[in-house]
Amino acid sequence: MPQLLVTVKISKGFKTWTEMAKSMEEKAGSEGAKVIWAATNPDETSVYVMMDVPNPEFMQTFGLREDVKKAREEAGADVSSTTVITQIGDYWLGD
């Protein structure tokens, strides 16, 4: 399963974004995706997310679904700013 490192601009802070992301876990999981970790920059205007996804196109096929897009926008995500930084080959989360 591919992993992606993705970023998106946010306007309502990290807590609001994470609440939305948690509410999407079941929907995303039913399509084979899972957030591995998420972090924000110091001023909470961008989120960086590492995800397991069923295929590299997942951000387009799932992330732009009308119901998902609406939830993301309501949580302050600038959906049009969503950018796949890179596909991840291997990673280490530390001890």
Features from the language model and the residues they span:
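Short S/T/G/P-rich N-terminal loop/turn motif that feeds into the first structured element of a domain
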Residues: 1-69, 74-95
